[in-house]
Amino acid sequence: MSTLLLVEAFYGGSHKQLMDLIKEEVEGCILYTLPAKKWHWRARTAALYFMQAILPSDTYRVLFTSSVLNLAELVALRPDLGKLKKILYFHENQLIYPVQKSQERDFQYGYNQILSCLVADTVVFNSAFNMESFLTSIKTFLKKIPDHRPKNLEEIIRPKCRVLYFPINFPDIRQYLPEHKCIPHNLVDKSSSDISYCPKTSIQTGRMSVEFSDHQIQCSIDESSAEQEKTTVSEKNNCEGVDHVILHSQSTLAGDIHQEKPLHIVWPHRWEHDKDPETFFKVLLKLKEKELTFHLSVLGETFTDVPDIFSEARITLGSSVLHWGYLASKDDYLQALCMADVVVSTAKHEFFGVAMLEAVHCGCYPLCPKSLVYPEIFPAVYLYSSPEQLLRKLEDFCKRPDIVRRHRFQGETERFSWAALRGEFRSLLDAEPREDL
């Protein structure tokens, strides 16, 4: 039996999600990993570690790895692995990583990724933005070499490149959804193949490809409000919160969130410089200065160096904070997302955005920069052009949180699901017969 060799030098976050999903869904996998710590050292030295860790086998046919690993080093150190079909997956690229000063950019990381592309058989990117920003930056990036620069590398690498969106295994969130996020069944196209139901109330929820305007939603809600009032008391929504409390109050976690409750903003990103937490918290502090009421959940993983703004903001925002810190339990994390109204990104470095799409799946209204990958993923209504525009949108939502709670996402998340992408991934990972094996 042929074996799919999975190698992940930074086994955490979306890197871990992808490897775990492939291992679970594709037969004949063997996985080698390094913990998601000290990213810079993983990028520098992982190949040497895997040279010794990966056991030799005649069954290997495909090697799948992320661009954290220097694939060129690994196949040079292990010629037996060089004979495999080598697939390199880019979650991010280092050629356009944001640094505060040009002198801070470490040339080696981007250079390693270019070398890895040259030895790979197939190079896969999680978005068109990721692919184009990488390929079109190669020439400029290599100008940092003082002389004798290599030529035409974009032309050499491009033919082996393709886009294959990150596959999200969207979970069943019905037990966590508050009532206002459950959609009356008469508003949903029943032909949609991606609709789930709250069993006790015949209310449909989940990822929808159907689009409704705010006006359509409001009219339908007004027409059915009397009937809903009759059923609300006698039939408890099956999407109410569970007993385990992760926020400050049981009332906040309960499924029956009334429209007058303060806007709940969630920030579910890594606590690092490239996610630009400074801009996010500056906007929230301005909301505070305007004496606007809101609740806040700051989630996401933390690593060795946490920006100072987090400790400062925690104190300043005080009673507005409902949850602060990483949630190791996926169920707790999904529960927190389901209780939020708006999910915000202020990223300066984003090539897909799993956290944003997961939050949208949980019924959050997304607000994203009009740059990076976001225009590729989200309709224009969810994009902002400046911190000032983000502030204005959040200010409006704080004054009228009911507008957000009535809104239904106007985009489509299903195309990013494992169900939609499974076939492409299986085809990608199929071994190609080789005479030299």
Curated annotation (Swiss-Prot):
Compartments where found: Cytoplasm; Nucleus
Molecular function terms, GO-annotated: tRNA-queuosine(34) beta-mannosyltransferase activity
Pfam families the record matches: Glycos_transf_1, QTMAN_N
Gene3D superfamilies xrefs: Glycogen Phosphorylase B
One GO BP: tRNA modification
Top-level taxon in the UniProt lineage: Eukaryota
Keyword vocabulary terms for this entry: Cytoplasm, Glycosyltransferase, Nucleus, Transferase
Family stated for the protein in its record: Belongs to the glycosyltransferase group 1 family. Glycosyltransferase 4 subfamily.
Function, as annotated: Glycosyltransferase that specifically catalyzes mannosylation of cytoplasmic tRNA(Asp) modified with queuosine at position 34 (queuosine(34)). Mannosylates the cyclopentene moiety of queuosine(34) in tRNA(Asp) to form mannosyl-queuosine(34). Mannosylation of queuosine(34) in tRNA(Asp) is required to slow-down elongation at cognate codons, GAC and GAU, thereby regulating protein translation.
Protein name according to UniProt: tRNA-queuosine alpha-mannosyltransferase
Biological source species: Xenopus laevis
Gene coding for it: gtdc1
